[in-house]
């Protein structure tokens, strides 16, 4: 599920909610 956040230059801020970077977009 996309978290509505990109992770091209910075890590996923939403990572604290279980999201991770995949193909430059944060997914949960």
Swiss-Prot record:
Kindly name one Pfam family recorded for this protein: Cyclotide
Quick one: a GO biological-process term for this protein?
A: killing of cells of another organism
Q: Does the keyword Disulfide bond apply?
A: yes
Q: Which UniProt keywords apply?
A: Antibiotic, Antimicrobial, Cytolysis, Disulfide bond, Hemolysis, Knottin, Oxidation, Plant defense
Cysteines paired by S-S bonds: 3-19, 7-21, 12-26
Entry superkingdom: Eukaryota
Q: Which organs or tissues contain this protein?
A: Expressed in fruit, pedicel and stem but not in leaf and root (at protein level).
Q: Which residues, renumbered to this chain, carry the PTM Methionine sulfoxide?
A: 16
About its domains, the entry says: The presence of a 'disulfide through disulfide knot' structurally defines this protein as a knottin.
Provide the family line. Answer: Belongs to the cyclotide family. Bracelet subfamily.
Q: Name the job this protein performs.
A: Chassatide C11: Probably participates in a plant defense mechanism. Active against E.coli ATCC 25922 (MIC=8.5 uM) but not against S.aureus ATCC 12600 or S.epidermidis ATCC 14990. Has cytotoxic and hemolytic activity. Chassatide C11A: Probably participates in a plant defense mechanism. Has no activity against bacteria up to a concentration of 80 uM. Has no cytotoxic and no hemolytic activity.
Know the name of this protein? Answer: Chassatide C11
Lineage of producing organism:
Eukaryota, Viridiplantae, Streptophyta, Embryophyta, Tracheophyta
């Amino acid at each position: 599920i996309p978290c509505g956040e990109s992770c091209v230059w910075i890590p996923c801020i939403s990572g604290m909610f279980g999201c991770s970077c995949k193909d430059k977009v944060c997914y949960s």
